[in-house]
Amino acid sequence: MAATPKDVRAGQPALDETDRTLLRLLQTDARMPNSELAARAGIAPSTCHGRVRRLTDVGVIRGFFADVDPAAVGRPLRAMVAVSLQAEARGEIRHFVGEIERHDEVIDVFFLAGTDDYLLHVATADTDALRQFVEMLNARREVAGTTTSLVFEHRRGGAPIF
C-alpha cells in the first residue's frame, strides 16, 4: 500500500479554476502528456508542470496509478470485509492498519464511523484463500469480529471529483 497520505484537511489548499481543470483532465487520463494537458487546460507547459507538481506536493493529487484488474492477475474473487475492533484495542489502530495493509490481498482500507471500524476491499485467488485471510483477521487479538460480503461486480464511478 502507499505511504501515509499528506493530510490536506488542516490547511485546505486554494484551488482555482485552472487547478480544477487539471484535476478533471488527469482523473480522465492520468497518462496524458504534459504538453497535451497544458493545451487542453489553456496554459503553458511549464505552468502546467508547476501546477501539477504543486498539487502533488500539497497532497491534492495523491499519486498516479495503474488500475489493474485483479482477475487478470490471478485474483478473481473480490470481497468487502467489515472489521470491528475490540474496544480496548482502539489505541492500536495505526499498528493494526499498518499490519493489514501489508497483505497482498488488501486493495483498499476504509476507516469508518458506525458499527464497524474498517472496511477492507480484498481480492483473492479463490474461496479458500479468502477464508484463510478472514480467519487470520479473526485470530488477531484486537479484532472483535468480521463480516464478509462477496463482490459480484465492481464499476468505478465515472464522474471526476471536480
Please annotate each region the language model reported.
Residues 1-162:
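A compositional/biophysical signature of low hydrophobicity enriched in polar/charged and small residues
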